[in-house]
Amino acid sequence: MDIQATTGKGFLHKSAEFVSPGHPDRTADGISALVVETHVRHNPAAHVAAETLLTSKGPIIMAGEITSAYHISPDGYKALARDYIRGLGWTKDFGYDPDKIEILVLYNSQSTDIAQGVEKGRKKIGAGDQGITTGYAIRKHWLPFNEDDLMPLPLVLARNTLFGIDQLRRTSKIGKVLKPDMKSEFIISYNSRG
């Protein structure tokens, strides 16, 4: 998230935050992506609109519309979510036990209205009402400058700080006390001279 504000005295304050993979927002996105990837890997013609809702204390709600020749039982979806959460480093000691967290699975078949709008017989004619938009910076060796020069400084600092802390959490003793849910925020004040 990037926020910009002025104080009216010639200063501009730019703020950016970055969250770790264990933060509820990214955990929910990761579980949804895993459901989509699992279906598409086994059935490339699958239609999957998977959503996940969770908080830092639970429960987890997995819902959406799925039409796929590959069947996953409700317990199978729960296992995907539990394994994903466990892989992020969540444990009973951190208060988010992957084996005990309540998970509610509410997937239905894709709406026939949407199916009629995207298929004609076996021929696909559209993508339905779902889409993904992604924005990111990429590294190009031929650029005459560092790609971080293209990103807002508060975002670069928030991202790099959290990457470093998360790496320490995964590889050192600090991981025994530092939970996977982390957020960093930087606020940079600029004056008229920059």
Residue ranges and their predicted role:
Residues 26, 69-71, 88:
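Glycine-/small-residue-enriched capping loops at alpha/beta junctions
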Residues 1-49, 54:
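N-terminal, positively charged regions that mediate nucleic acid binding
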Residues 50-69:
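Short, charge-patterned binding micro-sites
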Residues 23, 27, 73, 153:
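Conserved acidic
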Residues 15-19, 57, 79-194:
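Glycine-rich, mobile lid/loop segments that gate access to catalytic sites or pores
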Residues 69-77, 145:
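Short, conserved charged micro-motifs
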